[in-house]
A protein has these predicted regions:
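N-terminal Rossmann-like dinucleotide-binding module
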Residues: 1-51
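C-terminal helix-rich "cap/oligomerization" subdomain common to oxidoreductases
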Residues: 1-3, 9, 37, 72-74, ...
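Contiguous beta-strand/loop segments that form the cofactor/metal-binding neighborhood of enzyme cores
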Residues: 2, 179, 186-261, 288, ...
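Predominantly a Rossmann-like dinucleotide-binding segment in NAD(P)-dependent oxidoreductases
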Residues: 12-13, 129-209
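Active-site loop of classical SDR/Rossmann-like NAD(P)-dependent oxidoreductases
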Residues: 15, 41, 237, 285-299
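Beta-loop-alpha module in the N-terminal Rossmann-like domain of NAD(P)-dependent dehydrogenases
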Residues: 52-115
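Hydrophobic residues in well-ordered beta-strands that form the structural core
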Residues: 98, 123-125, 154, 255
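Rossmann-fold dehydrogenase core element
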Residues: 111-129, 149-152
Length: 330
């Protein structure tokens, strides 16, 4: 199996750049890490995170892009810089894994999509639930018609954070919707496709002394029903109430919680499957085996770079997802 020579650009306080880098480092038979760059002052802003990168060579972005032996780049900067560096990687003709959802400029993101599409390079985004084995199985069953025609999807992803992270949300249109709601919108679109209309609600909860929109919902209109996503940073105990409910004409899947930390980054997922028409039927409860949150994601990326696997998330899909996210952030 051919190793992928890879480098990483950036990391961030509230995303998963360090975990992604560690995942590559613990798979040396798959990834040969050439180095990393911290172009937006990450070393000074996040000194506590630098130990993960210390054994490897620090480079400039220009050195990474100019090295013809580096075929793949991981872009993990803070969200507001993602598209800026992703565009540079795309223009250099390199394959790319990028933290979700991209920067806040739709025009720049469209240019990014056009560039990777023209170059036919791998464009792989780090949406958290795409490689959750339970959700992969459930969505395949739903798409195969196991619960009949889908009527609605309800998705929630909340938690409680401190005031500093709440202030961080002010950098984004839609606040929490942009930051975490994107994961949920991805699920809704994969299950039901593009909605006929979107109705966004992005509010300030008042739980923190900030102006950030930390309470977000969006309603999606479909032909035969309504779906919604909800995300807030003002819900204590919200992590274990993160959930996905898929209601169909012949059954229902209720995934709750979406993740349980076992020994981070190891996770478990629990869900209930119900097809009975009896009011008191609790359905069948299933608990997954522990799985690594990032390993399947990065191993899939490597397989795409080697040409062994086709990316199921097309350029056009990523562009439609981003546009829908923007509509939910208004």
């Amino acid at each position: 199996m051919r190793k992928i020579r890879v480098a990483q650009i950036g990391t961030s306080q509230y995303s998963h750049g360090s975990e992604i880098f560690r995942t590559m480092a613990t798979n040396p038979a798959i990834f040969e890490i050439v180095g990393y760059a911290m172009p937006e002052g990450e070393r000074e802003k996040f000194p506590h995170m630098m130990g993960t990168f210390a054994p490897y060579r620090e480079m400039t972005v220009e050195e990474i892009l100019a090295d013809p032996t580096i075929e793949a780049v991981v872009v993990e900067t803070e969200e507001i810089y993602l598209t800026k560096y992703a565009l540079q990687v795309a223009r250099a003709g390199k394959h790319m894994h990028m933290e979700k959802p991209g920067g806040i400029d739709p025009v720049a993101f469209e240019e990014l999509i056009e560039t990777v599409k023209r170059n036919k390079t791998v464009f792989h985004l780090g949406y958290m639930y795409r490689y959750n084995p339970c959700l992969v199985d459930i969505l395949a069953r739903v798409q195969a018609g196991e619960i009949g025609d889908v009527i609605s999807v309800e998705a929630q992803m909340s938690g409680w954070r401190d005031e500093q992270q709440n202030r961080f949300l002010s950098a984004f249109p839609g606040g929490m919707m942009f930051y975490l709601g994107c994961h949920l919108i991805d699920l809704v679109l994969r299950i039901q496709g593009t909605p006929k209309a979107v109705l966004p609600y992005n509010k300030q909860s008042g739980a923190f002394a900030t102006s950030s929109k930390d309470f977000s919902m969006a309603l999606f209109e479909y032909e035969h029903g309504l779906s919604f996503v909800k995300t807030t940073q003002a819900e204590r105990g919200g992590f274990l109430r993160r959930q996905l409910v898929i209601t169909g004409t012949k059954g229902k899947y209720e995934v709750r919680p979406l993740e349980i930390n076992v020994a981070y980054p190891m996770q478990k997922t629990e869900y209930t499957y119900c097809t009975s028409e009896e009011w008191n039927d609790a359905g069948t409860h299933v608990a997954s085996e522990p799985f690594h949150r990032y390993e399947d994601m990065m191993l899939a990326f490597a397989a795409m770079v080697r040409g062994e696997k086709e990316n199921p998330f097309t350029y056009d899909y990523e562009w439609q997802l981003y546009r829908t996210l923007c509509a939910c952030c208004e």
